Amino acid sequence: MDKITVYTDDSALSNGRPGSGCGWACKLMYKGQVRMKSGGAIGETNNRMEMQAVLEAMKSITDKTIPVEVYSDSNYVVETMNGHFAMKKNRDLWRKLMRERQKFTSIRFIWVKGHDKNQHNNDVDRQAVAESRKALEAQQG
């Protein structure tokens, strides 16, 4: 069966501190095609960046009827998206994520061990770190 496979990751240098460089990345794969999306921010947290990566991935999928599997090394994101954790913090992003999720016919969230031998997870990790460094450099001028 055809499915879209997504890997997401975050980076937060000096996590949550004002002026910290942060980044997110997502890698979408479907029928041999691969697309990487990423971005950066200042002063965010690793959790918010991971959530942003998932949100950007979901928003970029145009055909919401194709089954999707989202792999993340964030237990916080995976368990909350699967309904096992309460949405106490970051409610603004959780609302956006849940609204976007409702548009899909089939979407699963799967935890993957980070900083291990999974090439796709390592790819998004490298990209998220690069984005956090780029955001920090841009801020410092």
Regions found by a protein language model. Give the residues of each.
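RNase H catalytic domain
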Residues: 5-18, 55-123, 127, 132, ...
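Extreme N-terminus of proteins, especially the signal/transit-peptide cleavage junction
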Residues: 1-3
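Short beta-strand scaffold segments in enzyme catalytic cores
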Residues: 22-30
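Short, glycine/acidic-enriched capping/hinge loops at junctions between secondary-structure elements
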Residues: 17-20, 37-38
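A short, polar/acidic, helix/strand-boundary loop motif
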Residues: 31-49
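Short, flexible loop/turn segments with low-complexity composition
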Residues: 137-141
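Short, conserved alpha-helix that lines the donor NDP-sugar binding/gating region
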Residues: 50, 54
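Short connector loops/turns at beta-strand edges and beta->alpha or beta->beta junctions
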Residues: 29-34, 73-77
